[in-house]
Amino acid sequence: MKVAVLGAAGGIGQALALLLKLQLPAGSELSLYDIAPVTPGVAADVSHIPTAVKVQGFAGEDPTPALQGADVVLISAGVARKPGMDRSDLFNINAGIVRNLIEKVAQVCPKACVGIITNPVNTTVAIAAEVLKKAGVYDKRKLFGVTTLDIIRSETFVSELKNLEPARTTVPVIGGHSGVTILPLLSQVQYAEWNDAEIAPLTKRIQNAGTEVVEAKAGGGSATLSMAQAAARFALSLVKGLNGENVVECTYVEGDGKYARFFAQPVRLGKEGVEEILPLGSLSAFEQHALDAMLETLRADIELGEKFVNQ
């Protein structure tokens, strides 16, 4: 199994490389690419960690050597959010970066599963889909927006609030990956009883957690370490699925279009990527209202990505 990380010299990419070197199955290959000349050094650095994962690093304008033979491609390249910016401000820079990298994926490893980390994910996944479609290689089972950060934040905040064991707390998070499009299904958390006064502020905290980190870093970047952990968790689930294990994760994929063309929901992963899109389950009145209210925003985010490629 070969996993390529594009954007491997950045704050997310370096931490992600470390986690994958530690956690990928023995015999895996880890390929690190970034435009920055430091990238082969990042690879040399993590290669000294004693695990049976082979690491290579590539720098420069062309990611082709890093992508050859890749089964999974994780894209974290792009600029980070600064105070006062929202994820849509990132669009102007990151849209072009994602488009260019996906054009290379389409040429070099068109059958790879691709996980998009670069924000704004609601839009960059749509960009990736349209680029792959133009190249004639789009398989909706193999393109994912990595929304796992919303899930790990939800698990952390819920377990703190309800005094639960974090490792055993699971919170489905549906919708998208910014602001009001992030919807944690708190009503589905086992062993947690809720009153109405708790739900709205906790939902808002989960939705705004990225801003919490951006402001706390005081201009020094956005969430990198927690994002890397979230991306590693998703990538490892994807690898397990590709190896034939039965794994369920919430992720932002093209499904049946009931809510929007792309929508984050529970998905069964398997040998072809998405094996099955699972139902949302029962929603509380608060959740149903929040779902209905987000859709216009989510659809507009998606349309922005489609237009970027097709204009």
From Swiss-Prot:
Signal peptide: none
PANTHER family the UniProt entry points to: MALATE AND LACTATE DEHYDROGENASE, MALATE DEHYDROGENASE, MITOCHONDRIAL
UniProt-listed InterPro entries: L-lactate/malate_DH, Lactate/malate_DH_C, Lactate/malate_DH_N, Lactate_DH/Glyco_Ohase_4_C, Malate_DH_AS, Malate_DH_type1, Malate_DH_type1_bac, NAD(P)-bd_dom_sf
Domain of life per record: Bacteria
Family of this protein: Belongs to the LDH/MDH superfamily. MDH type 1 family.
Active site per database record: H177 (proton acceptor)
E.C. code: 1.1.1.37
Subunit (UniProt): Homodimer.
EC class (word): oxidoreductase
Sites where the protein binds substrate: R81, R87, N119, R153
MF terms in GO: L-malate dehydrogenase (NAD+) activity
UniProt function note: Catalyzes the reversible oxidation of malate to oxaloacetate.
Lineage per the UniProt record: Bacteria, Pseudomonadati, Pseudomonadota, Gammaproteobacteria, Pasteurellales
Organism: Pasteurella multocida (strain Pm70)
Keywords for this protein: NAD, Oxidoreductase, Tricarboxylic acid cycle
Reaction(s) catalysed by this chain's protein: (S)-malate + NAD(+) = oxaloacetate + NADH + H(+)
Cellular component per GO, a single term: cytoplasm
Residue positions binding NAD(+): G7, A8, A9, G10, G11, I12, G13, D34, N94, I117, T118, N119, M227
Annotated GO biological process: malate metabolic process; tricarboxylic acid cycle
Gene that produces this protein: mdh
Protein name: Malate dehydrogenase
